[in-house]
């Protein structure tokens, strides 16, 4: 029941971080029973944070979809001044499919925000018995992915 309430509130109010990422550690977002590890839903953002120390020559952010989710469209964004929304992110990789990579050369030390956005969505229309969904309805189960940040 608690998970249902948390999912119902997702997308309402202030955005929340899914996690603070650690360099070199892949984070799997594929557990529907735990919201902090849940796949991303249609038109939703997942927000992460990472702290970059002094002396990092390059930061690479890799987003990889699971094989069963490879034909969904995920976008990847990064920002230093706050959440990485598509409209104001300093770095971004958009396009078809799930796998994306951002390379940030000579990142300044400090906090960086990383966001994953699911651009795949359904079509909703009024039918005889209410709202009917068509198109990519499989996205309603969420799109599983792995995100990893590496420093060089």
Regions picked out by a protein language model, each given a short descriptive name:
Residues 127-131:
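Short, surface-exposed terminal/edge motifs of secreted or surface/virion proteins that either
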Residues 2-32, 67-68, 72-73:
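Predominantly extracellular/luminal regions of secreted and cell-surface proteins
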Residues 34-90, 97-98, 105-111, 116-125, ...:
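Acidic, Ser/Thr/Pro-rich low-complexity intrinsically disordered segments
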Residues 3, 125, 141-145:
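Extracellular and select intracellular beta-sandwich modules with Ser/Thr-enriched
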Residues 1-3, 114-115:
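Buried hydrophobic-core signal for structured, non-transmembrane domains
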């Amino acid at each position: 029941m608690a998970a249902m309430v948390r999912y119902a509130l997702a997308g309402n109010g202030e955005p929340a971080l899914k996690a603070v990422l650690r360099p070199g550690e892949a984070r799997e977002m594929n557990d529907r029973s735990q919201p902090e590890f849940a796949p991303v839903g249609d038109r939703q953002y997942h927000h992460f944070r990472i702290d970059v120390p002094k002396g990092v020559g390059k930061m690479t952010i890799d987003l990889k979809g699971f094989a069963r989710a490879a034909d969904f469209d995920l976008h990847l964004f990064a920002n230093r001044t706050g959440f990485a929304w598509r409209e104001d992110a300093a770095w971004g990789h958009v396009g078809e499919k799930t796998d994306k990579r951002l390379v940030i050369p000579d990142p300044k030390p400090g906090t960086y925000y990383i966001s994953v956005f699911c651009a795949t969505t359904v079509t909703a229309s009024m039918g005889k018995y209410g709202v009917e969904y068509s198109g990519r309805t499989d996205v309603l189960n969420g799109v599983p992915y792995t995100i990893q940040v590496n420093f060089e």
